[in-house]
Amino acid sequence: MAYPVVNAPYGLKPINLIGGQVFAGSTREYAIPYGYATNIFYGDIVGLTRGNVQRLSVSTGTLGTVTGVFLGCSYTNPTTKQKQFAQYWPASTLAGDAVAIVCDDPDTVFKAVVCSATTVVASGARAMIGQNLAMINNTGNVNTGDSANALLAPSDTPATTDALPVRVLGLVPDTVVTLGSATYTSISTATVTCSALPFALPVGTDVGSLAANGQYIPSGSFVDTAASAGATSFILNQAPVTAFASSSTLVFAQYPELLVKLNFGQHQYYAATSIA
């Protein structure tokens, strides 16, 4: 069975709620300022200023100012004078009745793409679950109307600071890419030597090994620096939890998407201080 290929980030896509709550896909409408001069794309994070929606930069967090995620808008087209429903808000549109459709439930679980830089798709890993991640504030696509914001693949140990915008809840198995395997040779601190890799390893690649009985052993680590096909070594973010056995088979998987939630204190509904 062919699974979908993830070629680019798309911002935050709501899929569920935490705690087994019923997810109805409900949204709330907020006004967009007349002539608001910034594009807002489907999947962008937004906040409120004086009752109006504003697009937020999300790189390292926006403590207490997040209202939700933009999921389209409607407005009267100033040229045709017809009501228009759109995937994104075109900057500087002169419409006085513009409203944004926003997923504002602070318990929403989102799906998002992991990138190493700009829109370069990288990987998530099991070791990232429970950690906080920064995001990459990319410019969206006016042709599709979709956001291009992405999760930033961490280097070394994922950060724990509460200033970062999202918490990783899980992996998305539907789009995992099983890259293949290599034979383990040795390790020095976190640099692993192995047989020549027949494939490239993106940042964040999940690494495990096979036990003598055929069981899979998660390493609790991920690839820290991208490695090219043909390389005979790669660097982990940390030494594996369980040491690799001599000449064991190393297994590599790329998870381009992760499940995340807006961090506590980022969403204005979970912050006691009101917006300005």
Model-derived regions: residue spans:
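Ser/Thr- and Asn-enriched, surface-exposed coil loops between beta-strands
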Residues: 184-195, 226-235
